Curated annotation (Swiss-Prot):
It comes from Glaesserella parasuis serovar 5 (strain SH0165) (Haemophilus parasuis). This is Chaperone protein DnaK. Coiled coil: none annotated. Residues 600-614 have a biased composition (Low complexity). GO terms for molecular function: ATP binding; ATP-dependent protein folding chaperone; unfolded protein binding. The modification Phosphothreonine is found at T198. CDD domains: ASKHA_NBD_HSP70_DnaK-like (cd10234). Keywords: ATP-binding, Chaperone, Nucleotide-binding, Phosphoprotein, Stress response. The gene is dnaK. NCBIfam families: PRK00290.1, PRK05183.1, prok_dnaK.
């Protein structure tokens, strides 16, 4: 059985790890980095992922996609998506099923399809390290991800050629990574996870009993649209507004300029975690009739903190809710673990320390902990790790719409999963022959204020007065947090069930098509790589042959020389084309035409040998004479 890898599919960066013996190990990518930017770029010739995509973003802003995780499993009409439409340089569009998709070069693409490109890079990184194919993975998601977002993440894995063995929550994964190194008996930890696009807070109880560790999530809360991207956007807006005040030019209309500002803002934000001030210097950012304009502005740490303080405060609200749900006070938290790159900001660290009354742990790598935890869970599922038990929870309450437009909850939030719960309902009218089961996720009393996950009908109910039929509704949540709902008429035994895929999401047929497209692209990529290798081989042979012709000199007959040069020219011409077989044929033709050159080379080598032997004899005489001269002195 192959290894089950752990992947942290992040908004800004992604990371892959695997169990190496009994220890989890983060794997470096082809560029030598331990994390990979979650950036995908589509050019005329190829799809770029990670650092290569990031490098060309300034010149290709409309086809360079980032923070796609903020769109995954979301409806186009969601307020968060509408906010992103205003600030993203690429085009967010409405899919036929109402989902938020992206338009690239006139083609509509689903977020899982785009995220699959990052997962494919993670898969390849692991395969290069392990030296064997990888087909299974544990992928992490924010704890507060909805069912639709979890389904979409699984779909992305499937498109990338991975069987997703488990979806686990990011804070839980981070706690797994922390718990491996912690030998304390029993403790309660708070994982504060502020990443590139999402925020989670989980309260986790870690029990050590006879060498076995149990990780039980007591409560979780969060905001799936709060993260480093929002911090960046505050600084971007400030830079753009200051430039407009000074120069009278609005850079928001220039996507290339905005991409430069975005990069500079991200860099400045990172620098201000260690410095008190930094200079943003973007020469020739734009030009008007008066000439070129430069953006030069000093940003202090205090200014950045003033711009984002409300965002940090916003992150503390879910912390309060999670503590209340867990029935714990701040003083009962033994350790606070910071996860996600944005937690490197001193203001975030200070606010968290002030809230909990203790300094957060600094010995957990915020960029790698989640992937490490995912790898540990992969080890558990593969049977390689036997002393760890993970008990996660469902982040939001689940129920159905009942009479009067009310949500009746069947499974409360923070219930340990997997779980199953049934409840009996009845009809609202006399002789009602069918009921619609409308499945909801959320905490509000009014059904319409919660997220609709889908609906289905149970038909064929025998005519009876209202309130008489017995309809049993069952919710079943698996270990991935994915939901199945069934309704059964207890009188007739008729049953109807659905695996929730929300009213949106990708159909099986669409996923299969995307898998086929991905496989076709992989085949095209392989063929392109082989073509490049053949071209390089052709170039090396042509260069080597020309060099040999020059060295052969008069040892090569003019007629032979002309034939070989003709074969070299034919090969160089073929190498500029796209036909690998033609290049290979021309290489073969050149090798055949070069036979006289090989003979000339051998003749020249023999000649050289004879000259060397003669020279050695001569050298002996000279040495003797030299010695005699030396003696005379």
């Amino acid at each position: 059985m192959g290894k089950i890898i752990g992947i942290d599919l992040g908004t800004t960066n992604s990371c892959v790890a695997v169990m190496d013996g009994d220890k989890p190990r983060v794997i470096e990518n082809a560029e030598g980095a331990r994390t990979t930017p979650s950036i995908i770029a589509y050019t005329d010739k190829e799809t770029l992922v990670g650092q290569p995509a990031k490098r060309q973003a300034i010149t290709n802003p409309k086809n360079t996609l980032f923070a796609i995780k903020r769109l995954i499993g979301r409806r186009f009409t969601d307020s968060e998506v509408q906010r992103d439409i205003e600030i993203m340089p690429f085009e967010i569009t409405k899919a036929d099923n109402g989902d938020a998709w992206v338009s690239v070069k006139g083609e509509k693409m689903a977020p899982p399809q785009i995220s699959a490109e990052v997962l494919k890079k993670m898969k390849k990184t692991a395969e290069d390290f392990l030296g064997e194919p990888v087909t299974e993975a544990v992928i992490t998601v924010p704890a507060y991800f909805s069912d639709a977002q979890r389904q979409a993440t699984k779909d992305a894995g499937r498109i990338a050629g991975l069987e997703v063995k488990r979806i686990i929550n990011e804070p839980t994964a981070a706690a797994l990574a922390y718990g491996l190194d912690s030998k304390k008996e029993n403790q309660i930890v708070a994982v504060y996870d502020l990443g590139g696009g999402t925020f989670d807070l989980s309260i986790i109880e870690i029990d050590n009993l006879d060498g076995e560790q149990t990780f039980e999530v007591r409560a979780t809360n969060g905001d799936t649209h709060l993260g480093g991207e929002d911090f960046d956007n505050r600084l971007i807006n400030y830079l753009v507004e200051e430039f407009q005040k000074e120069q009278g030019v609005d850079l928001r209309n220039d996507s290339m300029a905005m991409q430069r500002v975005k990069e500079a803002a991200e860099k400045a934000k990172i620098e201000l975690s260690s410095a008190q001030s930094t200079e943003v210097n973007l020469p020739y950012i734009t030009a008007d009739a008066t000439g070129p304009k430069h953006l030069v502005l000093t940003v202090t740490r205090a200014k950045l903190e003033a711009l984002v303080e409300d965002l940090v405060n916003r992150s503390l609200e879910p912390v309060k809710v999670a503590l209340a749900d867990a029935g714990l006070s701040v003083s009962e938290i033994n350790d606070v673990i910071l996860v996600g790159g944005q937690t490197r900001m001193p203001l975030v660290q200070k606010k968290v320390a002030d809230f909990f009354g203790k300094e957060p742990r600094k010995d957990v790598n915020p960029d790698e902990a989640v992937a490490i935890g995912a790898a540990v869970q992969g080890g558990v599922l593969a049977g390689d790790v036997t002393d760890v038990l993970l008990l996660d929870v469902t982040p939001l309450s689940l129920g159905i719409e009942t009479m009067g437009g009310v949500m009746t909850t069947l499974i409360e939030k923070n219930t340990t999963i997997p779980t199953k719960k049934s409840q009996v309902f009845s009809t609202a009218e006399d002789n009602q022959s069918a009921v619609t089961i409308h499945v909801l996720q959320g905490e509000r009393k009014r059904a319409s204020d919660n997220k609709s996950l889908g609906q289905f009908n149970l038909e064929g109910i025998n005519p009876a007065p209202r309130g008489m039929p017995q309809i049993e509704v069952t919710f079943d949540i698996d270990a991935n947090g994915i939901i199945n709902v069934s309704a059964k008429d207890k009188n007739t035994g008729k049953e109807q069930q659905i695996k929730i895929q929300a009213s949106s999401g990708l159909s099986d047929a669409e996923i299969e098509q995307m898998v086929r497209d991905a496989e076709a692209n992989a085949e095209a990529d392989r063929k392109f790589e082989e073509l490049v290798q053949t071209r390089n081989q052709a170039d090396a042979i042509a260069h080597s042959t020309r060099k040999q012709i020059a060295e052969a000199g008069s040892n090569l007959a003019d007629a032979d020389k002309a034939k070989i040069e003709e074969a070299v020219a034919a090969l160089e011409k073929a190498a500029k084309g796209e036909d690998k077989a033609d290049i290979e044929a021309k290489i073969e033709a050149l090798v055949k035409a070069s036979e006289p050159l090989i003979q000339a080379g051998q003749a020249q080598a023999q000649q050289g040998q004879q000259q060397a032997q003669q020279s050695q004899k001569d050298d002996g005489v000279v040495d003797a004479e030299f010695e005699e001269v030396k003696d005379n002195k």
